[in-house]
Amino acid sequence: MYRLEDTNSGGVMDKNKQKLSAYGSSGGSVDAAQGSGSGGGRQRHAPLYGRFVDAEDLPATHRDVMHHHSSPSSSSEVRAMQARIPNHFREPASGPLRKLSVDLIKTYKHINEVYYAKKKRRAQQTQGDDDSSNKKERKLYNDGYDDDNHDYIIKNGEKFLDRYEIDSLIGKGSFGQVVKAYDHEEQCHVAIKIIKNKKPFLNQAQIEVKLLEMMNRADAENKYYIVKLKRHFMWRNHLCLVFELLSYNLYDLLRNTNFRGVSLNLTRKFAQQLCTALLFLSTPELNIIHCDLKPENILLCNPKRSAIKIVDFGSSCQLGQRIYHYIQSRFYRSPEVLLGIQYDLAIDMWSLGCILVEMHTGEPLFSGCNEVDQMNKIVEVLGMPPKYLLDQAHKTRKFFDKIVADGSYVLKKNQNGRKYKPPGSRKLHDILGVETGGPGGRRLDEPGHSVSDYLKFKDLILRMLDFDPKTRVTPYYALQHNFFKRTADEATNTSGAGATANAGAGGSGSSGAGGSSGGGVGGGLGASNSSSGAVSSSSAAAPTAATAAATAAGSSGSGSSVGGGSSAAQQQQAMPLPLPLPLPLPPLAGPGGASDGQCHGLLMHSVAANAMNNFSALSLQSNAHPPPSLANSHHSTNSLGSLNHISPGSTGCHNNNSNSSNNNTRHSRLYGSNMVNMVGHHNSGSSNNHNSISYPHAMECDPPQMPPPPPNGHGRMRVPAIMQLQPNSYAPNSVPYYGNMSSSSVAAAAAAAAAAASHLMMTDSSVISASAAGGGQGGGNPGQNPVTPSAAAFLFPSQPAGTLYGTALGSLSDLPLPMPLPMSVPLQLPPSSSSSVSSGSASVGSGGVGVGVVGQRRHITGPAAQVGISQSVGSGSSGSATGASSSDASSSSPMVGVCVQQNPVVIH
């Protein structure tokens, strides 16, 4: 066997030798013919792996191929080889090099056209097959009504509930789709939000429905810029929410400006409406956090108007029911959410600050591509966050490194190569173009864009963009900022009969001349500032010249005369308060209304005094603290703090961190010189010493007050319940008042509180006044003319006006009244058979300062004086007096929120 293999292998080797010798001889002849002299017929070849080889060294197959090509056997092979050589060449313009370089776009366009043409032909050829094959698959998704993304398949012209005819698709999102539809019952177009047919989306949409229904009940008159939910229903396993149809959103508006931004005036109108909406959301009955405030979620009501509404509460929650940690769109995400600190309603204020800058500049203020980039861009503008915030945040190490030596923090080194400016070096001053004519200098010399306007805007934005949510400006304070201060030539209120936009609406034919800081109050509301205030009063008969002269110059007592019924003669006797009133009084609704001169002791001795104290300091610091809360102040023995909730919403916000009881005792007696001392004190810091409270810039407009709670009885809170108010509640809780109260004045106080509350919210007007009434302070014997039982003719109000900010107005029976209030000199009224209180709307303009309550007219017994209470602030020479004792003095004054027209101005 082995021998056979050797024999065979030897035979193969012999054959190879024969071939090799034949190849060598033929090679030698070729070389001889060519005269190459190859030396013994050996042929040299190109180096193989670095050395020259002979033909013998090549494998047999290589030698055969080489021999075949080196000696063509026939002319046919030669011709075939020649045919393969090109005799013409391609034009360079049409060559592949040009097509794939210079003409690359044209090449790909051609490729796309060819591809989609083939795809279309293929789809047309197999359409019937596809329809039949997809039917089974589509039935897997809600019987064919849904696509594979669990969205409802929209068909134009389809009717939901045989009522809503689908018009078109408006938009899509992670939640589902929004379609425009026609409501055949109400004959109007609506927007229907169709939620995905998935359990998580359905659950969140049900929370949205609950929150929207709460807000719509609290905003029955549709004044607080929240989208109106008409109804909701289930349709083929999809929850459908029917909304009013609005226009395009603020991002679309920016895009229409080519991202150059809108004017500062229009930005102000947007800001005012949004602050009012946030103030509404912050009421204790709601405490709703939007959690996704951005330009896309703010829609214009009309494309030619500035009225807006907030939409998309799909991510929203209430303060005590936070369920998400990853919230807010990145550009508008607050530092506490980025850092992982517990958040509250203040995150919406941060978003609002970012939105306002973007609306004016046209570009996002902080446009991070991820959270780390976002934090770096925030630090570029605002500097480093406070150390105490970073110490308590559990995501600090994601953004910052801690220096061991001193415990301070520095930004982490960037891993992606981006370079950032040093902390705080990209100034908001430069971004807004405060001194350079606005962003990019585009607003240079444009009216309403002065350096002063920009400085106010910048100051407001910096307060909104405070790192610490506890010191970030609240909506209530923001609305009182100087940025919203109206000028005499710009009116943004709309008012009906009996009220004007720029002049104070008088109550009953009263008029007064007031200075720019004016404290003039019509009809029984003593001026707090005799140097500039003017008081006018009219009785049932025409006032005499002496009365007019007396009221034009006099003020009542120590300047805290609030309420009705004070006569000109009494005001003439009082000592004027020698302190100026630099800012307008907060909205006070003084219904007036006792039967004799003792009526000035009905409620609070120091309402006007507190108002002056609270508003006389133009606080510029960001941590201006609100007034003390009832939770702390009602324990003071001499302050009667437990009655604070008689006048909710008067002058400020409650502060859950304050301890006011330790300083209230010094204000127990406020008449005479003590009141001057009280007004003279101001607190410029952030301590709990609340005998003096500093406020931010106050706008010359009444801040919006909240609507009454829903009539379900939940609003009647006793004092212990009031102590449970949530922290950072933005709306003012009450105005503290001080002094002692007699048993007779208790009934009078209850009566006046009832009257004030009954005027608090009128359904025929959108002017919302905080109810507060006060007693005039003057020098005299506090024992004359005690309150007659007829003062109790003002019965306690019914529940609809009984509460505000979670504070009971409807009952004084639960309130401890430790000491009697000292009565000052009674106010003598001209004799007559009856007295009527006619009230106008509180408005802001160019007269004195005063207060009005909208709507009702009450008859009381005793001496007659038609008491008109008006409010106007400004620098004009006279306040407008309208109404003339009419029961509908301001029955149709639809002020939309605060200082925003019902029919807003045209966008420019």
UniProtKB/Swiss-Prot annotation:
Protein name (Swiss-Prot/TrEMBL): Serine/threonine-protein kinase minibrain
Catalytic activity, as annotated: L-seryl-[protein] + ATP = O-phospho-L-seryl-[protein] + ADP + H(+); L-threonyl-[protein] + ATP = O-phospho-L-threonyl-[protein] + ADP + H(+); L-tyrosyl-[protein] + ATP = O-phospho-L-tyrosyl-[protein] + ADP + H(+)
Cellular component, GO annotation: nucleus; terminal bouton
Stored SUPFAM superfamilies: Protein kinase-like (PK-like)
EC class name: transferase
Keyword terms, alphabetized: ATP-binding, Developmental protein, Differentiation, Kinase, Neurogenesis, Nucleotide-binding, Nucleus, Serine/threonine-protein kinase, Transferase
Gene that this polypeptide is encoded by: mnb
Expression sites (tissue/organ): In ventral nerve cord and supraesophageal ganglion of embryos. Is most prominent in the mushroom body neuropil and the outer proliferation center of the optic lobes in third instar larvae.
Residue numbers spanned by region Disordered: 1-46, 119-143, 552-592, 623-669, 863-895
Comp. bias (Basic and acidic residues): 132-141
Domain of life according to the entry: Eukaryota
Origin species: Drosophila melanogaster (Fruit fly)
Active site: 292
Keyword Mitochondrion: no
Entry coiled-coil feature ranges: none
Effect of disrupting the coding gene: Flies exhibit a specific and marked size reduction of the optic lobes and central brain hemispheres but no major alteration in neuronal architecture can be found.
SMART domains noted in UniProt: S_TKc
Residue stretches of biased makeup (Polar residues): 623-654
Enzyme Commission numbers on file: 2.7.12.1
GO terms under biological process: cell differentiation; circadian rhythm; negative regulation of cell cycle; negative regulation of hippo signaling; nervous system development; olfactory learning; positive regulation of DNA-templated transcription; positive regulation of feeding behavior
Function: Role in the specific control of proper proliferation of optic lobe neuronal progeny.
Biased composition, class Gly residues, residue ranges: 556-566
Comp. bias (Pro residues): 577-589
PROSITE patterns: PROTEIN_KINASE_ATP (PS00107), PROTEIN_KINASE_DOM (PS50011), PROTEIN_KINASE_ST (PS00108)
Low complexity bias locations: 567-576, 655-664, 868-893
Similarity annotation: Belongs to the protein kinase superfamily. CMGC Ser/Thr protein kinase family. MNB/DYRK subfamily.
Positions annotated to bind ATP: 170-178, 193, 243-246
Region forming the signal peptide: none
